[in-house]
Amino acid sequence: MAEGKGRVCVTGGTGFLGSWIIKSLLENGYSVNTTIRADPERKRDVSFLTNLPGASEKLHFFNADLSNPDSFAAAIEGCVGIFHTASPIDFAVSEPEEIVTKRTVDGALGILKACVNSKTVKRFIYTSSGSAVSFNGKDKDVLDESDWSDVDLLRSVKPFGWNYAVSKTLAEKAVLEFGEQNGIDVVTLILPFIVGRFVCPKLPDSIEKALVLVLGKKEQIGVTRFHMVHVDDVARAHIYLLENSVPGGRYNCSPFIVPIEEMSQLLSAKYPEYQILTVDELKEIKGARLPDLNTKKLVDAGFDFKYTIEDMFDDAIQCCKEKGYL
């Protein structure tokens, strides 16, 4: 069977980002292996993936779990690129941080070892998070790829999502170090809130948080400025980093930072049918003020962001309407 641009693997394919990357890869002529957790009773509905254009010929599913990194070997065999988007998310801290971190780090390293053994993988692209950059205690207005979150500070202060931030920080450091030591090309893409359309049936957490003013969930506002990127730009950036001979290492992918007051004005003007919290009502909110994330390195590497702030909100709101969340 002809494989067009080649075969790639996307871990975490049923997630918000993973499913959109799969959609984009299929549209770009790739054959795609994706991993999902075992479902012996076949209760999981993956029709949102199998119904994608081209999926019947070019999308293949493999059972794998981060708790057993060796389980990814079959999915990686014969692939030229790996997009590792799967990551445990436990904002409720239902498990000890050490367990979540070990699963995240060991899972990523196990997948990398399978990449080395495959002899075919040319580049491993790890989906990281702005939380691996922003929590460092530095008094800086702008952060870049040289900045890392301070794990000791996170474990001491325990801000919202601290366990996730620790796991992503240590996993990103581990995959970059593994790449250097084992001669495999590793790129990490550092993401903020991802906003836009979605093909997965569940309302993605990042969209729920980005639309907090539309959904009327004032109590969930934890920051006063939102780093944002359109999901399609994220998928495009992942594919760009696979297809182009840019240097390995870290890349920030956060083109916009939107103050919550600006968000209120934009949404209330365009969507008067929703009871958007006003600027005056937002003055009492004392959330964290995150620094900017500089995306110059990614842009200098030749990547162009396609979508505006308005595009992100328009696409997310329209999709939420279509799926019954609004």
Curated annotation (Swiss-Prot):
The record's listing under Pfam families reads: Epimerase
InterPro entries linked: Epimerase_deHydtase, NAD(P)-bd_dom_sf, NAD(P)_dehydrat-like
Q: How is its activity regulated?
A: Inhibited by vestitone concentrations above 50 uM.
Positions of NADP(+) binding: G12, G13, T14, G15, F16, L17, G18, R37, Y164
Copy out the induction comment: Transiently up-regulated by fungal elicitors, peaking 6 hours after elicitor treatment.
Any one GO MF term held by the record is: (3R)-2'-hydroxyisoflavanone reductase activity
Coiled-coil region(s): none
| Gene Ontology terms describing biological process | defense response; flavonoid biosynthetic process
| Tissues and organs where the protein is expressed, per its UniProt entry | Detected in roots, and at lower levels in root nodules. Not detected in petioles, leaf and stem.
Q: Which CDD domains match?
A: FR_SDR_e
Which domain of life does the protein's organism represent? Eukaryota
Keyword Protein biosynthesis set for record: no
Q: Describe the pH profile of activity.
A: Optimum pH is 6.0.
- Report the family membership: Belongs to the NAD(P)-dependent epimerase/dehydratase family. Dihydroflavonol-4-reductase subfamily.
Annotated function: Stereospecific enzyme that catalyzes the NADPH-dependent reduction of (3R)-vestitone to (3R,4R)-4'-methoxyisoflavan-2',4,7-triol (DMI). Has no activity with (3S)-vestitone. Catalyzes the penultimate step in the biosynthesis of the phytoalexin medicarpin, and thereby contributes to plant defense reactions.
Its protein name is: Vestitone reductase
User: Which species is this UniProt entry from?
Assistant: Medicago sativa
Biological classification of the source: Eukaryota, Viridiplantae, Streptophyta, Embryophyta, Tracheophyta
